[in-house]
Structures are given as structure tokens and as C-alpha cells.
């Protein structure tokens, strides 16, 4: 639940540099996640930690490796005022939660202990004793995330094999 905080316009090439895409396995992606702006990220991030960033998170390339790298590191979610649309869609498609909340993204600090209740949209900063209300996911998107991604959701509904 520890926060890693970054600025605006975090590009997909910063999340996972293109030079590391020759091995698209989750473990390989995780080992290089955020290394160009935070060389210690991959070695210090723990399951359940949260990334908070400025607007337009995930801009740049359309590849799904960027949200997959974050998910593979164990990141619980990303909180930002806005996301590049293709990153948003790719994150949902792989079952990785992203939360839009400008005030929380501005006020949460690096190192804070934060929790997010995806069913209600409530973001709680335990360190600061503050809460913010984000819009919860619509039911169909929540279902995709809970299933672990679009393909798993379709399989559960018998639409795909």
C-alpha cells in the first residue's frame, strides 16, 4: 500500500522501455518497470503498492506491455487525474485497475500508505488521514477487472474458449 509518485505525461516507453520488449514475459517486464525514471522501482516495489501520477499517465505507444509491467510488479493500481485512452483500455483489458481522481493524485505523497476500495471508489490515505471519492467502475468494467481481464471475463461468460 506504499505510494510511488511520478509527474505528468508518464510515457509507456518510460513505464517499460522498448529495448526490453524482446522478452514479453511478465517477470522480464516487471524487472525493468519504471527503470528509466526510478531505477530502484522494480527492486523495491511490493505487492499491493500503488503508483500515483500526474495527468495523461500512459501516453505514447499503444502496446499493452506498459500496464502489464506494472501489474506484473504487483502494483495494486494507478491513481492519476487522467490516463491516455489507449493505456486506459489496455489496463482494463488485462484486469489492471486504474483510478481517475485529480484531487487524490495531487495530495497523496510518495511513501504514503494508501488503500483503494474499487467497489465504492473510496481512496484512503492512511498516512494523512484523508479520503477522496473517485467514480467507481461501471459494473461491466468491474467484472472485467475482477475476472483478471477481458479474455478471462469472456471465458467465464462462455463467449470465448
Give the ranges of each region predicted by the language model.
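Acidic, glycine-rich flexible loop/linker segments
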Residues: 94-161
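Feature captures the catalytic cores and cofactor-binding loops of soluble hydro-lyases/lyases
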Residues: 16-18, 22-120
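Polybasic, low-complexity association/targeting segments
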Residues: 1-23
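Conserved phosphate/anionic-ligand binding catalytic regions in large, soluble enzymes, centered on
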Residues: 10, 58-64, 145-155
